[in-house]
Amino acid sequence: QGGALSVVASAFSGLSKKCYVSEPSYCCLHKRLELGSGVFGAAKDYLRRYPEYTDDALDTLTYFDINNIVSCLKIPTDFCLALADPVCLPEFVYSAYAHVDAPKQIHIYPFVPHYTPEDYDYFVHSEFSKL
């Protein structure tokens, strides 16, 4: 949730100078629900038992989907994309990145699972020292 929170805080606070996004799990929520990946496995099971709530659930999830919030970013944004992440699927993270309508950069890490690579941590720390 940290990656998603950085987007929300940066998009709506008006205080951020730059947004750093690593492992934003709240991308393409309708697809995550369909796949049942991560925390959405329980929600998928629930909707399988109670399909009459599916439309309401999908409508509500759109409010929390980072893909619908990144367009509010007006500051430079930096994404970390781990290609072997089974939780924050790379294609979903890239989709959020593609929706950013501000100066943006993406750091791609092949073979990296669900964690922030040390190299990206160093990059972010060096950037903070410049702000």
Q: Which residue ranges define each predicted feature?
A:
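Active-site nucleophile elbow and catalytic-triad environment of alpha/beta-hydrolase enzymes
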Residues: Y53-I69
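C-terminal catalytic histidine-bearing segment of alpha/beta-hydrolase fold enzymes
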Residues: Y94-L131
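Acidic catalytic loop of the alpha/beta-hydrolase fold
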Residues: L83-C88, H114-Y115
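Hydrolase active-site cap/lid region
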Residues: V8-E52, I108, T116
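Glycine-rich nucleophile elbow surrounding the catalytic serine of serine-hydrolase chemistry
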Residues: Q1-A9
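Short alpha-helix in the alpha/beta-hydrolase fold that links the catalytic acid
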Residues: I75-T77, L89-A98
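Short beta-strand/loop motif that positions the catalytic acidic residue
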Residues: L73, D78-L81, D85
